[in-house]
């Protein structure tokens, strides 16, 4: 479709971190942004181009267009365990509740559970996810069928999967079209043998892929890794050659000095998941330290079983608020920096450089924020309003790849929400 937005406020998220809000128009031709400006230069900019016939012209008065949020760590299909096994420490939660239920999942379950998660993403202004779960091709297919953009990775561990299967999934998902891609990864050091980790490292070398894993989520995880190997998870995975082509870690709460050095030297990304870390009492990530070291930071929700809400507004607020508490410094990690993490930095760690900001030639992955709501007024500082007082209620529209998938409470993903809800409830009822 060809869509023209006019009378809009536009936050492009410039590369140099200049957080300017312009006023004017944004044009989408097919799946690509083809014009951003105040309209006065259209004749010059578009000289020689064919006349665009608009499928829709949207008056965006009172709204802000901005890049969609990039959920840089999640387990989407864990929607079936939302509010099922709560108020437990991480290891008990995993071994006594999560793993036994996950053993009963089949591929068709994954498909419908994933669609449920995608619906929630869209209401939160999330336009892509970095998803780790079983049956990555099935997850990817659910995303494609909804029109959603996904980056899949592997949850390979000692209890399921193989390096051969990881390679097959890597090749298959990366051949499924422009909405799906795959980055090599595995679950965590504490669930994965050295032999498997060596296989992952070899595969990353073969395909020049980054590697991502759960890393330093809890103090116990780090202690036990040091007991086994005499080094932290970051140091071990680096020693195994994981990061020749970059990558990073999810959580990164309990980091040591050498870990920061490795992240900086290898150009790795730390993905913080504050709500999950609070709920599981894992700790508060050293966000300010990462920023001070020049280490890239992105934000994820983690899964709906450990969060339990797939809401980037909550994650952004917690990222900055917890950093202020941890450092006893109300000035650290400003709202603008957090907004950059949730959009541009997330896209880059996911390999989505073609939709990391709003610019001509970039993919049209964008959202429209309704500023005419009590929590967004007055407009003293719109960016700070988004982070400190914004919520899902302000997401008026979510567009992925030029297609409006969610608009003011209505989904256009090709599925009846009631059918999706019924399928998800049937999965968990079967397991009780």
Kindly give the residue locations of the regions a language model identified.
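Active-site microenvironment of metallo-dependent hydrolases
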Residues: 1-24, 28-34, 342-432
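Alpha-helical scaffold segments that flank or form the walls of functional sites
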Residues: 82-147, 168-176, 423-430
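Active-site gating loops and adjacent loop-to-helix segments of metal-dependent hydrolytic enzymes
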Residues: 80-112, 146-154, 174, 219-246, ...
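Histidine/acidic-residue-rich catalytic or RNA/ligand-binding cores of hydrolases
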Residues: 163, 219-231, 259-263, 281-290, ...
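Divalent metal-coordination and catalytic microenvironments
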Residues: 8, 26, 31, 62, ...
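His/Asp/Glu-enriched, well-ordered alpha-helical/loop segment
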Residues: 239-246, 288-371, 389-390
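Metal-coordinating catalytic core of metallo-dependent amide/deamination hydrolases
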Residues: 138-258
